[in-house]
Every structure is written in C-alpha cells, then in structure tokens.
Amino acid sequence: MTAFFAVGLSAQNKCTVSGYIRDAATGETLIGAGVMVMVTDAASGGKTSGISLGTNASAEAKAKSSMANSKIIGAVTNEFGYYTITIPCGNIDLTYSYVGCADVKQNIDLQRDTVINISLLQAASLKASTIVGRKDAGIQSTYMGALEIPQEMIKNMPVVLGEPDVIKTIQLMPGVQGGMEGFSGIYVRGGGADENLMMLDGTPLYNVSHLLGLLSVFTPEAVKKVTFYKGSFPARYGGRVSSIVDVRTNDGNAKGFHGSVSAGLLSEKLHFEGPIASENTTWSFSARGMHTFLFDRLIKAFGSPANYAFYDINAKVTHRFSDSDKLFAGFYTGRDYFRYSDSDKSSSRYYGPDYEPYTKYEEENTKMNLKWGNTLASVRWNHVFNSKLFANTSVSWNTYKMNMVTNTRELLKSETENYDKQYRYSYTSGIRDLGARIDFDYIPAPTHLIKFGGEFVNHLYRPEVERSRSINNIGGNKETSDKVNDASPNLYGNELSAYIEDDMTFGEHFSFNPGLHLSLFLVNGRTYFCPEPRAAVKVSFGKGWAVKTAYSRMSQYVHQLTSGNLSLPTDLWVPITKNIKPVTSDIVSLGTYYSGLKGWEFSVEGYWKQMNNVLEYKDGKMSFSSAADWEENVEMGQGQSYGVELYVQKTLGRTTGTVSYTLSKTDRIFRDGTINNGKRFPFVYDRRHNFCVSLNQKLGKRVDLSAIWTITSGNWMTVSTRSTLTLSPDGKGMSMVDYISSRNNYRLPPSHRLDFSVNIHKKKRHGERIWNFGMYNAYGAKNPNWVTLDSREVKNPDTGKTTYIPALSKKTFLLFLPSFSYTYKF
C-alpha cells in the first residue's frame, strides 16, 4: 500500500527542465535539436498493467515489462535554441541529440525545476539521431509541406557559376517551380513570384534576387538554418499566400576567431566570426561582391554593351546577459548596379539648293544607370520568464529602393544647322517598413506547446517619382526645362496581426495543431480584416508510418506588378486599395509518410488550392505607362491549383540525395470577360510534370561529388496565330495587327539538364582548403533562357497576298557553363 502511495505521489509531482542546446565547437545555439527521456506509464500518471512480477522473475522479464510500460517524452529547441520539457520528478536519464552530432546522455536526480545548458560535439560521420518532440518541419512535424534545408545541402548543390544558393536549393523540392531556365525565382503550388514570404531573421525582404534572378541575396556562409513551408502554415506566419522561406543567420562563434575566404568565377566572399571580450558577446560578418569578367559573356548574349555588379553585407552582434536574457542586433544591405552605355556616330554627304556639297556630322550618346536593393536592421530580445514561458521581442526597419537614371545627348553639326539636345530622366520607387513584434512560447503541460503573439507594421509605398531635365541648344539659343512627376503619391498602410496556435499531442500516435491568425490592414481610409484559420493533424501508425492532413487560409496585402517572365527591379510593389482587394488562398492537403527504413524518408502529398483576387493585366495592357494608372490596367480573378507530390530523401551513408516528382495543374479565370473572354486559361508556370534527382557521393575523406538532373514541362506563353499588315488608322502608314486566340496558348518544349560539381578538401596547418569544380548544363541541352516572338513573311503564290506567321526566337546562353572556386576555412 505504501508503494502505491509513493507511485501516486510521484505522478502528481512534475518537474521542468529547460535551457539552451549549443554546438560545442562554436557556441552557436542549435535549432531543432532534441531532448528526450523514457518514463514508465506509472511515473507519468498512466495506468499499470495490473501484472505483478515477483522477486524470482528474471531480469530480462522485468526489463521487457518495464519497456512495455514505458513511453518517450521529448522536446525540440525553438529558433533560438531554447528547449523546455516537463517530466516526472525523480532519477532520470536525459538524452540530447542533433543531426551530425554525438548524443549526450545525462543522469540527474530531478527534484525541482532545473536549467540545463548542453553543448554537443560534431560526430566524425553523419549518424541517425533520434529526435522526439515537436518539430516545425520534416516528417516528425505535425505540419505538412514543411521542410528543413540543411546548410550542407545548400553548399554542396551544383549551381550556375559555382555559387551556392538558398532559393535554387528550394527549387529542388516537390511543388516548387523555377522561373526562367537557370534563374532563382520560385513559384509554389500555382502561386506567383510575389506570393512567397522571404524572411531574414524574422524580417521580410521584398526583392531577393541578384543578376535579374540568377542568384538570391542570401549568402550561404551567413546562413544557419532554412525552413520552408508550402502546405500547412503555422499561425505565427502571415502576409503571403503561397510559401514561407524562413532564413536564420549565424550568431557568431563564442569559442574563438574563425572564418573563411572564397573566390570564384563570379564573386569573392568573406566570412568572419568570433567572441568580443568573452563568450557572452559574439559577432558575425559576411560580405560578398561580384566581378564581371565572366558575366559579361551572358550580358553580351543580348547584344548590349553593359556592366553589372552586386554586393551583400551581413552583420550581427549577440550578447548574453544571463541564461534568461539575450540581445541580438542584425544588419543586412545589398545592392545591384546595372550600367549601360552606347554611342552612335555618323557623317553624311549632302547637297544644298545650289548643289553645293556639305557634310553633316551626327552623334547620339545614351547612358543608363540602374541600382536597387534592400537594407534592413533589427533588434531582438529573448527573455525567459520561467521554465514554461519564453518570449522574443523584436523591432525592425526595412527598406527597398530602386533608382534608374538615363542620359541621352544628340549632336548635329553642319554648314546649315547646328544643335545640341540633352535629356536626363530619373525614376525612383521603393518601400519602407517599420515593425514591432512579440512572440511567446508557453508550455503549460507536456502535451501542449502554445505559441501566441502580435505584430504591427507601418508600410510606406513610394510607387513612382519621375524627374526630367531637357537642355536644347539650337543655333546658339539655349532652353532648359525641368519637370517633376509624382505620378502616384505616397501610400501609407498600417498592418496589425495577432495569432495563437497550440501543438497538442494525444498519446504517442496523434497530434493536432489548431491555430488562428487575425490580420487588419488600413489604407486610404479603408479597413480590411482577414481571419485566417489553420489546422494540421498527424496520425502515426507505428513502424515509421504516418498520415497527415491540413487546412490553411492565407491573405496578402501587397502585389508585385510585372509584365515579363523575369522579376525585374522596375516591377512595382503596390498595396491593396479601395478597389483592389487582398489576395486570399485556401489550401487543403493530405499525405502519407514513411521513415521506418533507417536513413530514408518517403512522402506522398496531394493538395488542392483556391486563390482569390489574383491580379493579371487586362488584354492589350501587358505593361503600364506610369504607376498612376496601374489600377485601370489590371483585373482581379481566381486561380486554382491541384497536384500530387512525391519525395524521397536519403540522409545517411556515403551516398545521400533526394528524388522529387510533381504532377500538377494550375490555371486562372477572370469571369468579367476582360481577360481571355472570361474563359479559364493555364498559368504561365503551369508545368504538368517536374522531376528532379540530386546525388551527393563521398569518394573518400577528401573528395565528394554532387550532381543534379532535372526534367520539367515547358512554360506557357501567349503567341499570335497570325499577323496581318493593315492600313493605320490615320491612313498614312501600315501597321501590323496580331490575332491571338487565347491567353497562354503555347507551351514551350520540355527542358532538362545535368549539373555536377566536385569538392576537393585538404587539411592545412591552420584550417582547410577546398577546391570546387563544376559544370552547369553538362551535356549542353538547348533549353531556352530567353524567348521572343518574331514574325516570318509568307507570300501566297496564287493570290500574291502576303501574310505573316508568328515565329519564336529562342536564345540559350547557359550552355556548358564551367565553374570553379577556391575556399580557405580557418
């Protein structure tokens, strides 16, 4: 009877263990690290089997009975490396684990709430870490379509010109389409390029492309962790309707000064980090800059004399006041510069009224300078109130700005006339955000992880400001004219949001995550309110099998107006207005998963997605003359996307890799008839089939090989079926009239390519040297990187009538593109 009383008392006494899990070599906190403990059902408050084993029972029988009446309780660190786990008090064995690190086991006599900070050592070889607990991504997560992108996967993938890239790695995932061949835009489950929330340490970025989309702004050396959501979205995220890319950067090495330098065909990179005075304060700095001697070849493929350059700078300082308080200050800035200059000179022989000869000299000079980029700064404060309540408070400032300046000059000199005409034009647009946010993690019981918080963002949109100056000097008479055209005045928008979600577990086989995101947007006297319910369910059947289903509603208050297949810096970001409503999406997903085979993960997911208030240009309005008239040239409609995604990943051994396949269909419809006569038409990036295989092979201690092979259906584009030469309306000339049967009426041929790279490592006295050699499009597939619509003249021999047949001109300039780079790490 005394024994039963003791068990009952223990069941009522719970203790909480909390703290940070760090990398022993660097002091960096580890995101997604696990802690677990095995407890008996009796100790955890469960029912006993009612079978008593006597003193003569064998130790093996007792062990089997103990295992049968035991269960595992686990927890996972959040995005700041903090964990908390509530378990029965008493003598326990805690196991801490992280992929690629050796497990740490710790026995403690737990009698009260306790703080335990643990450091894990990297293992000599990648091992299978058993992480039990609530993860935000992967098969173990309750969420669907949530993936963690390992840093090593990003660095090892072969890409254009040998530059590892976060966004290009995400393109390998099922359900994700790339934009133009070779470029880094992503289109997720039928959504547009502007429907992806790109976050750097919790702060959104508006333009994440360099080189017109060839690379993203995320420098791999600065990246600590990347989490990608495309199916079920945690309630703490909002603002976009298709995907979330959450990039977290390094805090800095607390153990010593370390870094790397790298040089390749495209850019040079620096990364340094270390402590300041003590391990409590750390810093991290990364910089990347471009040289253009190889990229000039790509620019010249368009037949234009141009120069291009870009840079990125990441900086971060972290200070730990105590185990309960930590302060972060982060900064990023990046710029792209595009310069174009052209000059045309000519001289002609003419005759005057009396047939006297004279020479006319003409000269025309054109220069254009275009620059754009992001700058952001943020300060975050972590505070641990107690073992069950964790908070993060942040304030941020973010700006995106684009500026274009063109200068033209026309000179003419002759015996009869003389003039000098100069014209300068500047165009500026941009966005500025000021935000404040607070997030809480609250664990009232082992079966609940409640996240809640709120955010306020003040948006300033500056769609377009034009300035021009003309100077005309004709025959010695000089005239100057200045003009300022603020085509669209400043637009202010205030966005407020609040959320709550609860990741609940019911036993070992069922988990449920309900959530609600509420958002309010105020602009020009109009208020929009969008409730966004979210829910995700996971049912585990044992032996690695699981089934998940989810529903998410998302809303978006900003649009990007683009008239081409590339995301260009001149594309405008504009907010919703009184006439343009928020974009909303509803997505339902169902999938099955298997992880019972050691080192392997398999998944099959199906989804259906409905989008409302998506924007397209009206027929005949594929571009706009100024930001003032953009609302008149676009129309709101609906879109739908549905498909099936298969994903296989091998994570252990000398050979690792992924296989992904997507079968999907995406279309749009504008029922008012202003687009495609109100009929449904395919989305530009409706690619029916998308197949990708990636492979990483260790060929020894010093050499590793990576390869990617992809094949995908072609994009859609709008082409005219015939063209007719007709008399212009003024009767003074001829004009070409195109007949277009429907929007997006032609699918480009499928594209495929093989990329590979080889890394050669060598240990040096004070670090490691890495040579990288790669080849993009290794067998020279002629996939179109640029497509234009021309016409071909055809003459009917019987009637003599001339017609013009559309003809596509396809340019391929990413062909047999080699790369190499040198990296030294210390």
What residue ranges belong to the model's regions?
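Surface-exposed extracellular loop regions of Gram-negative outer-membrane beta-barrel proteins
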Residues: 343-344, 348, 401, 543-588, ...
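C-terminal beta-signal and adjacent terminal beta-strands/loops
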Residues: 702, 711-734, 749-755, 759-826
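Short, acidic, small-residue-rich periplasmic hinge/interaction motif at the N-terminus
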Residues: 22, 34-40, 62-64, 93-101, ...
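Face-selective signature of the C-terminal outer-membrane beta-barrel domain
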Residues: 318-336, 368-524, 540-542, 603-604, ...
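Outer membrane beta-barrel strand-and-loop segments of large Gram-negative receptors
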Residues: 424, 429, 433-437, 486-487, ...
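Periplasmic N-terminal accessory/gating domains of Gram-negative outer-membrane beta-barrel systems
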Residues: 76-78, 100-102, 132-233, 244, ...
